[in-house]
């Protein structure tokens, strides 16, 4: 592969970044995959698969591994960032000096900035300046299923219509990967952050043993919280009925491939927060997102009772069953009020 003929450079060689790189390469594109740990990248190159996360999925020939960041970024103008939300800003600042003059940035990171609760678009603008085109992809995607070529659909949003069109064409594969465009840049970002929080609650409910009725109620009222917060931030409420909202919410609340759900289940079964995180062994985005989403809601005066109770459990030591009873004991109200 020549240094400047790749369709996409993927930053982040974890399970999801690898799965997206495989999907792009399988679609017939030349792809460069870079990760921060050279030893890990060298192991991927030697095995031609990600043995840690996706051991049964061989890399297509058109997927190139790269340990040198400057070389990886020189290979393509299109850069897909797939890193945890708490390091998102740091990674973009690391990329900035090496980006091509015509670079365009899209991310699959789901969450808000650690501590500040800012949307990732604001973090990206601060790190990269005002001229680089930005986009986000989000939706119901488990890395193992995506890498295996199982049917998957996501949403894509960008303020730059040309970039959005190019990305949709680049990512879309009629055989297995469907990409819906969405003009709501804020909503597509926010859905991926809030669903992480609600998934912890759904897992916690199941861990306690409350059953399907309670889980479904949490999903439904969690969607209401997501929609209220989105409306306050200027998002289109209909976005939350799509892939980046309801789609991702249902997936992560109901399937044990979700780290957030498994984390919540452990808490519901009586495990402490640190032990549950250690047991998962990977980043649980919803843990940090809970604090950040609640702070954002309070800033905008949005009521989010599920998120608030989860914050009490995660950061104040409240018992999970007691938190559930606090939600059930709230004042009676109209289901559709302030949606």
From Swiss-Prot:
Organism of origin: Pectobacterium atrosepticum (strain SCRI 1043 / ATCC BAA-672) (Erwinia carotovora subsp. atroseptica)
Record keyword Nucleotide-binding present: yes
Disulfide bond positions: none
Record protein name field: Glycerol-3-phosphate dehydrogenase [NAD(P)+]
Chain sites annotated for binding sn-glycerol 3-phosphate: 110, 139, 141, 195, 248, 258-260
Keywords for the protein's UniProt record, in alphabetical order: Cytoplasm, Lipid biosynthesis, Lipid metabolism, NAD, NADP, Nucleotide-binding, Oxidoreductase, Phospholipid biosynthesis, Phospholipid metabolism
Subcellular location: Cytoplasm
Active site residues of this protein: 195
Pathway where it operates: Membrane lipid metabolism; glycerophospholipid metabolism
